[in-house]
UniProtKB/Swiss-Prot annotation:
GO BP term, example: lysine biosynthetic process via diaminopimelate
Record-given protein name: Diaminopimelate epimerase
Gene3D superfamilies, sorted: Diaminopimelate Epimerase, Chain A, domain 1
Organism expressing this protein natively: Lactiplantibacillus plantarum (strain ATCC BAA-793 / NCIMB 8826 / WCFS1)
Top EC class, one word: isomerase
Keyword vocabulary terms for this entry: Amino-acid biosynthesis, Cytoplasm, Isomerase, Lysine biosynthesis
GO cellular component: cytosol
Protein family membership: Belongs to the diaminopimelate epimerase family.
Pathway terms, separated by semicolons: Amino-acid biosynthesis; L-lysine biosynthesis via DAP pathway; DL-2,6-diaminopimelate from LL-2,6-diaminopimelate: step 1/1
Domain of life: Bacteria
Subcellular location: Cytoplasm
Catalysed conversion reaction: (2S,6S)-2,6-diaminopimelate = meso-2,6-diaminopimelate
Residues annotated as the enzyme's active site: 82 (proton donor), 236 (proton acceptor)
Length: 332
């Protein structure tokens, strides 16, 4: 049986998009895990240049919803949400159904998505909702500071003597620290990220996404992320959304609710807007590219065994346009 996938990315956070409706019966969870582990390997061991994960598209039985998205990380674990991936799934479903404004089912919520103006020629963009938001330690799977119920801009002595952290789920868990530039690019993020995702630590036994954030100016931040199940990534959409929320809550001298925030990352740039509802619940808009790099086809049996010799691929040309867009960002 042949399997068709699309290599996609948002801000360089790259995935293989797999539409399960192409099969008579969906793949088992075990097969999805094995597929992700195989094709996502880097350093030439995976399919082409590997990926951060697999975006699994299925039909949804929810009303007014075009489809369902699941996220399988490169290590085979399942993530509850992926903002960058959601933009590419939104584009795929919108194109398939000739719609530009709809909802997509995710693990915890049916989220609003919408096509927006292209970032540049051949760089299509989408806006997606990031929610729900909670600071609850139990939901986060966090055990820190004598089992504090929340951690917002506080030191966690076991992690660092100097840095202050905020813990928030959007809905996947994030640990965020605002830092200076030297700390942003230094080794501390890798040390903390690896430790918090080793499966042995007692603070986040199930792991956590760790981000360092540098304030660049009014409504402008840089976010660098060590992603749970992936490691260092070019960008993490939920991390940039969570970082934007904490930026608004902790740095209102520089930004505020309902203002467009320019978020730079190692893979490019996105825009975010943080909203607060009447019931004081938060949600974010994540606005960024939804790039389709190539369409690949290969026998499923070979993909599950890590044999990519029979693969065929068609390049879309969009990656060149995206790289030009990023290069122009650097010149601005």
């Amino acid at each position: 049986m042949a399997v068709k996938m699309i290599k996609v990315h948002g801000s360089g956070n790259d995935f293989y998009l797999l539409d399960q409706t192409q099969f008579q019966a969906p793949l088992s969870d075990a097969d999805l895990k094995q597929l992700a582990i195989n094709i996502c390997k880097r350093d030439g061991a995976g399919l082409y240049d590997g990926a951060d994960g697999v975006l699994v598209v299925d039909k949804s039985e929810h009303p007014q919803v075009l489809g369902r998205m699941r996220v399988i990380n490169a290590d085979g674990t399942e993530a509850s949400m992926c903002g960058n991936g959601l933009r590419t799934v939104a584009r795929y479903l919108g194109t398939q159904n000739s719609q530009e404004d709809f909802r997509v089912q995710t693990m915890y919520a049916d989220l609003k998505v919408q096509a927006v103006a292209d970032f540049a020629a051949h760089v299509p963009a989408y806006s997606v909702e990031i929610s729900p938001v909670t600071f609850d330690a139990q939901t986060l799977g966090m055990h820190a500071n004598n089992d504090a119920t929340t951690i917002i801009n506080e030191k966690i002595p076991a992690l660092s003597a100097d840095l202050k952290f905020s813990a928030v789920a959007v809905p996947n868990p994030h640990l965020i620290a605002f830092v200076d530039h030297d700390t942003l690019v230094g080794p501390e993020l890798g040390r903390i990220g690896e430790w918090m995702n080793d499966g042995k630590n007692q603070i986040f036994p199930d792991g956590v996404n760790v981000s360092f954030v540098e304030v660049l100016g009014p409504n402008s931040i840089f976010v660098r992320t060590f992603e749970r199940g992936v490691g260092f990534t070019n960008a993490c959409g939920t991390a940039m959304s969570a970082s934007s929320l904490m930026y608004v809550l902790l740095h209102q001298e520089s930004t505020d609710f309902n203002q467009e925030i320019h978020v730079t990352n190692p893979g490019g740039m996105v825009k975010t807007v943080v909203h607060q509802g009447a019931d004081e619940e938060y949600w974010m808009e994540l606005i960024g590219n939804a790039t389709f790099v190539r369409i690949v086809t290969l026998p499923l049996e070979d993909a599950l065994q890590g044999d990519y010799s029979p693969v065929t691929a068609t390049e879309t040309g969009e990656q060149v346009a995206y790289e030009d867009f990023v290069a122009n960002l650097a010149k601005a």
